[in-house]
Structure formats: structure tokens, C-alpha cells
């Protein structure tokens, strides 16, 4: 004879949530496309480029300054959403010396965006080629978190959060004296 298993009420919800998120994660992984060798080769090339770009003294200094300031005063994602495409603040991020450098690097159309972020995930500089970044602060997003830790590339193709193009997210840490102080984030086109 089998006994029924009774769980204390304090365990029921956490267990159900665990099962739900396990199934959701598995379903999400099933939808992601694995990397074809040609895409993997492109990702490897651009990871190497991002490492070099992230070490540029202008980039390192811009991130260092943003960390010192704490990002743009009073900026948050809700306020960021309200900014128009021609807002002076957005133009400043694009037309600063580091923004111009990032824009020049993004002219290579294999990458769909290029964003520089400080240690808190705040946008430091961006290219205007791919349009306004969707988030001012992306500290909670995997590309930023993984880039800061040195886990540099996703292993699957998914629609990009900003451009909606099929791509592979890549991010590298911006280092100062061997310590990660920010992230240079891009997406390698898979189209």
C-alpha cells in the first residue's frame, strides 16, 4: 500500500514554483537555436575584437568616470523610456568621444549594437547606428551579469531584446588593474 505524501504548507508554494520554472526554462532552451559552425566562428572573431576594444584607454576612462559619478544623475529605466530619439542626453551618449569610437566600431554590420556600461549596468556610451538602447540600466540582464563575470558569449541564437534580430549576445568586461569595472556588450548577427 502506498502512503500519500503530504507537504507542509510552507513547502508547497516553493516546490510548485521550482517545478514551474524548471519546465519554463526547459521550454525556453528548446526554442533557442544552437550555434552553427559559421556563426560560432563569427562570435569568436567578435569576442576577440571586443576584448581589444574594451581595453582602449578612452573606454576604460569613460567607465571609470561613470562609476565615480554613479551614472547619469537621476536616470532610471522609466525616465529613459520617455526620452525621444533626438534628446540631447541621447546625443551626448552617441557623440561623446567614447560614443564616436563605439559608433566607428559598430559600422562593421556583423554586430547589431554596441553598448558600454559601468559596473552598475548604467549606459556610458552607445552607437546611434542601431538606435536607442532599450534600457538605460541592464544590471539584471544576463549579458551584463555574465560579461562582468567573464562569461562572454551566449551559446544559442535568440532574438535580440533591442533589435529583435536573430543574434548571439556577447559581452566582455572592461578591466582596470585586472578588476572588472564595466561591460562592453554587443550582439553578433545570425541573419
Show the residue positions of the predicted features.
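Solvent-exposed, acidic/flexible segments
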Residues: 36-43, 91-95, 136-137
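Short amphipathic alpha-helical segments
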Residues: 94-103
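Extracytoplasmic/periplasmic ligand-binding sensor regions of membrane-associated signaling proteins
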Residues: 128-183
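Helix-start (N-cap) segments at beta->loop->alpha junctions
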Residues: 186-191
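N-terminal secretory signal peptides that target proteins for export/translocation
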Residues: 1-11
Amino acid at each position: 500500500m502506498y502512503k500519500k505524501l503530504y507537504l507542509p504548507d510552507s513547502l508547497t508554494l516553493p516546490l510548485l514554483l521550482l517545478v514551474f520554472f524548471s519546465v519554463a526554462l526547459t521550454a525556453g532552451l528548446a526554442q533557442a537555436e544552437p550555434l552553427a559552425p559559421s556563426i560560432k566562428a563569427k562570435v569568436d572573431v567578435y569576442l576577440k575584437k571586443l576584448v581589444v576594444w574594451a581595453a582602449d584607454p578612452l573606454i576604460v576612462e569613460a567607465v571609470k568616470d561613470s562609476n565615480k559619478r554613479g551614472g547619469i544623475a537621476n536616470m532610471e529605466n522609466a525616465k529613459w523610456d520617455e526620452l525621444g530619439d533626438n534628446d540631447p542626453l541621447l546625443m551626448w551618449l552617441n557623440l561623446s568621444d567614447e560614443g564616436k569610437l563605439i559608433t566607428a566600431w559598430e559600422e562593421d554590420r556583423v554586430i547589431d549594437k554596441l553598448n558600454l556600461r559601468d559596473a552598475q549596468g548604467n549606459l556610458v556610451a552607445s552607437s546611434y547606428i542601431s538606435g536607442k538602447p532599450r534600457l538605460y540600466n541592464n544590471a539584471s540582464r544576463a549579458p551584463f551579469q555574465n560579461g562582468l563575470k567573464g562569461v562572454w558569449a551566449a551559446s544559442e541564437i535568440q532574438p535580440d531584446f533591442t533589435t529583435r534580430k536573430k543574434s548571439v549576445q556577447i559581452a566582455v568586461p572592461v578591466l582596470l588593474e585586472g578588476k572588472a569595472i564595466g561591460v562592453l556588450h554587443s550582439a553578433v548577427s545570425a541573419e
